[in-house]
Amino acid sequence: MTTQPFLGRRGFLLGGAAVGAGALLTACTSNTPATQDAPVGGAGNNAQPGKPITIGFSAPAADHGWIAAITKNARAQAQKFSEVTFNATEGTNDVNQQISQVETLINAKVNVLVILPFDGKALTAVGQQAMDAGIPVINLDRVFDTPLAYRTWIGGDNYRMGVNAGSYIAKQLKAKNVANPIIGEVAGIDSLPLTQERSKGFTDALAKAGYKVGPRVSAQFTPESGEQQTANLLQSATKLDALWNHDDDQGVGVNAAIENAKRSEFLMVGGAGSKNMMTLIKNDSSPIKATVLYSPSMASTAVALARLLGQGTGIGEFAEHDIPAEITTYSAVVTKENVDQYADVGFDS
C-alpha cells in the first residue's frame, strides 16, 4: 500500500476545479489483486481479502487529540486490508469546505463513505446525496438529522458515559462512608447536545445514589479552557470530595489547575480515555483515579464496517447477513485495576 501526501488547504484553493477530484484526496492504494470474492451474509472469515474497494473518508481538522486519533485510527485500519484504497480529504472545520470535499468523493465514485461531520445537521444533505447515488455512508459519531443520510451509524453513548462516571464516583464515596459529598463537574461546551447528555447521565446516576452535582463549570474541550474553568471551580469550592471532567483533552488543563492549587483531597474521573490520563491512573499518585471511555477506536471499526459494506459482506460471527444499522460503543470505566487492558485504545492529548 502506497500513500500519497496530503495536499495542503492552500494548494486546493489555488488549484480549483482544474485539478479535479485528486486535489482533495490522499490515497492509500493497494497493488495487491483480490484473491477471492467475499462471501455474502454473516458466514466466512472477514480477515480474508475480498474484492478491491475504495473507501472515502472525511473528518474535521485534527486540532484536538480525540479528532486526531479518529483520522489516525481510520487510516491505520485501512492499511490492514490489502484490497482497500483509502481516499481521505484534508480535515477541515469549515462546513462548506467539508461538504465540497464529500461531493468530490461522491463524484470520484468511491464504493463507501465514512463521514464524521463537523456539524451533523449541516452535512445531512450531502450524506443523503451520497446515499441517493448508491454510495453507502458510515456516519461516524456526530449523527446526521435523518437515517436517510446514512446506511450505518457508529458512535459513543454520551448519556451512558455520564452514568458510568457518576456510578463510579458514587460507589467510591459510599465505600468511604462519605456523608453529603461535594461533587464537582467540569463539563464541555454546554450548548452541545453531547455535553447535555453527559451531564444528564451524571446527574441521574448521582441522584440514584442519593447524591447531587455541586459546583459546576463548562470548558471548551481545550487544555487552556480546562485549566481556567477548573481554577475558577477550585477557588469557589474550598472542599471537594469528587470531580468529573468530561474530556481528557481539556483534562490536561484540569490537572494543571489542580496541581497549581495544590489540591488533592478529592478523587477525579476523566472522560474519553487519553494515554496521559491512563498513565496517571496507573501511577496512582494524583487525584485522577479513573476515566470513562469515549474511544476514537470507533473510527477503526467504522472503516472495517465500510470494507464489509463495500464487499457485500456481513460480520463473520453474526447470524444476520447484513451490517447493523446502528452500533453504539460502550463507555467502560478505566481504573488502576484494568488500565493495562485498555492501554491500546488510549490516544495522545
Annotate each language-model stretch with its function.
Residues 1-7, 15-27:
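N-terminal secretory signal peptides
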Residues 28-37:
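Bacterial lipoprotein signal-peptidase II cleavage site
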Residues 37-53, 186-190, 194, 294, ...:
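Hinge/cleft segment of the Venus flytrap/periplasmic-binding protein
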Residues 44-73, 77, 81, 86-101, ...:
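Extracytoplasmic "Venus flytrap"
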Residues 66-79, 161-168, 193-211, 229, ...:
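Short, solvent-exposed amphipathic alpha-helices that sit
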Residues 98, 154-180, 225-227, 273-278, ...:
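Hydrophobic alpha-helical segments within soluble ligand-binding/sensing domains
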Residues 115-132, 202, 219-279:
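Hydrophobic alpha-helical
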Residues 121-160, 179-182, 275-287:
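Flexible loop/hinge segments that line or gate small-molecule binding clefts
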